[in-house]
């Protein structure tokens, strides 16, 4: 097959490109007339489309090769007439790019042919001119062939670059698939002390390194000889190195650790088995907390990678700066994202300053307590609400479920609140780690607890105020009762005093009455006749009798009946006393 056939097949069948760029197709054999015709036609087409600057720059490069080809053509023409006639036919067919005068001269036969030697019009001067024209035509032909060779070499380099980029994309996809498979195996198989060192193969960029080495081998094997091909090969090698670095960073699950606050807490419970057998990680299963990721924990495993793997890492880090942010975001989304979206975002670079290459010996002095062992809380109603669908039936977000705390968490929070009503940032972080809660939950719990305490104090204050008001009312009632009782006592005392006064008056009257009969007895004892007569006289006067003259004994003169009216008023007042006197007289007489 000829080069022209491959040139026509190149756009449809790019797989024939390595055969076109090989050396045995670029040079045509001198004894093949069809190959010479095809090469001449291809050279003419290439010379018509080539630029002037490219032709001028390549003239100096092709001067030595033209001279060698000229001598070879001369020898061929002298040795074989058929080859010279073939060369002349090539020159005549490719003369479309020359001037018309040259074309008219090229129509003649070669002087070495038998027809031209038998011509009677041939002279010596036209033969020299014909040789000079042949020499120029051969130079131009070789120059066009060299330009055509450069064009095909640049085209082959571009095709090689495209194939290499396709190969790079395939390698990157394979690396990503292997990374996903390795991550699934890491999550499904619990690590142990034995396979922690064997798990370094997941960290090492062996697939990417092998892919990059194969790329460099293919570049060295298929590299063209031109300057443009070497430049494209160097660009392809840089692109391949960058893609291999990105694939290595994506394939290693521990390349770029995400920033977390608590590096000693892991997301997956099975990841504590391998770390507990390492130095400085004894008993980490007591601190198992399902709320935090295992990215930084697994970074301590990557610290124990051997020196050879570290050297393999170092050769890719200089090209991975552009893809580091995207790979870190992808690894953070694929490995460790909190289910609530509120994981700590503080940098973890300053948290573990004493972590060594042998496996984090700086964490050995962390305090561990029995109450740090927590039960699984993933089955709580709060988790079902949070991890479920937030969108309601009308498209609005559902109301977030109420946070439920375990009895242990509530007890520890109450203990802390008993001593401190307000927490510092450091203490809040410690409690959040110990109770497997976030700082926001701790802060909200303390706010609610302070509000609850405020309400309790307000209720106690109201109760005390009510009790005080009750006491005041009772005191008022007691005061009123005492006043009433005092008034009653006063009244009773007044009544008693009145009774006593009455009794005293009665006693005085009785005494007076007793004294009066004694005096009357004494009078009657001395003058009984006089008393008898006075009483009888008084009775007579009281009856209003108009008797004659009464004789008075003891110095009493005779009364006149005319003075009875005046004596009646006095007798009415002395009626009582006289009655008593009559009784006394009757007693005495008896």
UniProtKB/Swiss-Prot annotation:
DNA-binding found in the keyword field: yes
Keywords, in A-Z order: Developmental protein, DNA-binding, Homeobox, Nucleus
One annotated GO molecular function: DNA-binding transcription factor activity
Originating gene: abd-A
GO biological process: anterior/posterior pattern specification; apoptotic process; cardiac muscle tissue development; cardioblast differentiation; determination of genital disc primordium; dorsal vessel heart proper cell fate commitment; genital disc anterior/posterior pattern formation; genitalia development
GO cellular component: nucleus; polytene chromosome band; RNA polymerase II transcription regulator complex; transcription regulator complex
PROSITE patterns: HOMEOBOX_1, HOMEOBOX_2
Record's compositionally biased regions (Low complexity): 53-101, 109-139, 196-214, 487-517
Subcellular location: Nucleus
Biased composition (Basic residues): 140-151
DNA-binding as UniProt keyword: yes
Compositionally biased intervals (Basic and acidic residues): 468-481
Record-annotated DNA-binding residue ranges: 398-457
Family: Belongs to the Antp homeobox family.
UniProt short sequence motif Antp-type hexapeptide, positions renumbered to this chain: 368-373
Function field: Sequence-specific transcription factor which is part of a developmental regulatory system that provides cells with specific positional identities on the anterior-posterior axis. Required for segmental identity of the second through eighth abdominal segments. Once a pattern of abd-A expression is turned on in a given parasegment, it remains on the more posterior parasegment, so that the complex pattern of expression is built up in the successive parasegments.
Gene3D superfamilies: Homeodomain-like
Primary location: nucleus
Compositional bias of kind Polar residues: 215-225
The protein's name in its UniProt record: Homeobox protein abdominal-A
Chain spans, region Disordered: 53-154, 187-230, 468-525
């Amino acid at each position: 097959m000829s080069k022209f056939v491959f040139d026509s097949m190149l756009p449809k069948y790019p797989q024939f490109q390595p055969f076109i760029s090989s050396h045995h197709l670029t040079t045509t054999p001198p004894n093949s007339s069809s190959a010479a015709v095809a090469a001449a036609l291809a050279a003419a087409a290439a010379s018509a489309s080539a630029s002037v600057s490219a032709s001028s720059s390549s003239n100096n490069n092709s001067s030595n090769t033209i001279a060698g080809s000229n001598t070879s053509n001369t020898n061929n023409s002298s040795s074989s007439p058929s080859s010279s006639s073939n060369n002349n036919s090539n020159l005549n067919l490719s003369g479309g790019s020359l001037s018309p005068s040259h074309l008219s001269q090229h129509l003649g036969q070669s002087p070495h042919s038998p027809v031209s030697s038998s011509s009677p019009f041939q002279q010596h001067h036209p033969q020299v001119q014909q040789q000079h024209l042949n020499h120029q035509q051969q130079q131009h032909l070789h120059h066009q062939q060299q330009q055509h060779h450069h064009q095909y070499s640049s085209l082959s380099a571009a095709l090689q670059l495209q194939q290499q980029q396709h190969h790079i994309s395939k390698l990157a996809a394979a690396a990503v698939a292997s990374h996903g498979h390795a991550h699934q195996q890491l999550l499904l198989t619990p690590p142990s002390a034995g396979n922690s060192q064997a798990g370094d193969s997941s960290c090492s960029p062996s697939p990417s390194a092998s892919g990059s080495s194969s790329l460099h081998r293919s570049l060295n094997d298929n590299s063209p000889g031109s300057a443009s091909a070497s430049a494209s090969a160097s660009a392809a090698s840089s692109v391949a190195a960058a893609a291999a670095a990105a694939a290595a960073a994506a394939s290693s699950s521990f390349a770029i650790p995400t920033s977390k606050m608590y590096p000693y807490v892991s997301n997956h419970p099975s990841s504590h088995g391998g770390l507990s057998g390492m130095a400085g990680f004894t008993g980490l299963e007591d601190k198992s907390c399902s709320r935090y990721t295992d990215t930084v924990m697994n970074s301590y495993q990557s610290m124990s990678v051997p020196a050879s793997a570290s050297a393999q890492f170092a050769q890719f880090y200089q090209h991975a700066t552009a893809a580091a942010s995207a790979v870190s975001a992808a690894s953070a989304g694929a490995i460790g994202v909190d289910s609530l979206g509120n994981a700590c975002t503080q940098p973890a670079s300053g948290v573990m300053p004493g972590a060594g290459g042998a496996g984090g010996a700086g964490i050995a002095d962390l305090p561990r307590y029995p109450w740090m062992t927590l039960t699984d809380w993933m089955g709580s109603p709060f988790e079902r609400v949070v991890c479920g669908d937030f969108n309601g039936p009308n498209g609005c977000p559902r109301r977030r479920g109420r946070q439920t705390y375990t009895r242990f968490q509530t007890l520890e929070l109450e203990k802390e609140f008993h001593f401190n009503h307000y927490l510092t940032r450091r203490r809040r972080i410690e409690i959040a780690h110990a109770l497997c809660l976030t700082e926001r939950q701790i802060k909200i719990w303390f706010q609610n607890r302070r509000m609850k305490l405020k309400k309790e104090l307000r209720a106690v204050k109201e109760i005390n105020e009510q009790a005080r008001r009750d006491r005041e009312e009772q005191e008022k009632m007691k005061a009123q009762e005492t006043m009433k009782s005092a008034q009653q006592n006063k009244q009773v005392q007044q009544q008693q005093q009145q009774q006593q006064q009455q009794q005293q008056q009665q006693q005085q009257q009785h005494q007076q009455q007793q004294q009066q009969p004694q005096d009357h007895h004494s009078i009657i004892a001395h003058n009984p006749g006089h008393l008898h007569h006075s009483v009888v006289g008084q009775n007579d006067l009281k009856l209003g009798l108009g008797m004659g003259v009464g004789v008075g004994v003891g110095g009493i003169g005779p009364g006149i009946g005319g003075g009875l009216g005046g004596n009646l008023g006095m007798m009415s007042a002395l009626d009582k006393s006289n009655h008593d006197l009559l009784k006394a007289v009757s007693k005495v007489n008896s």
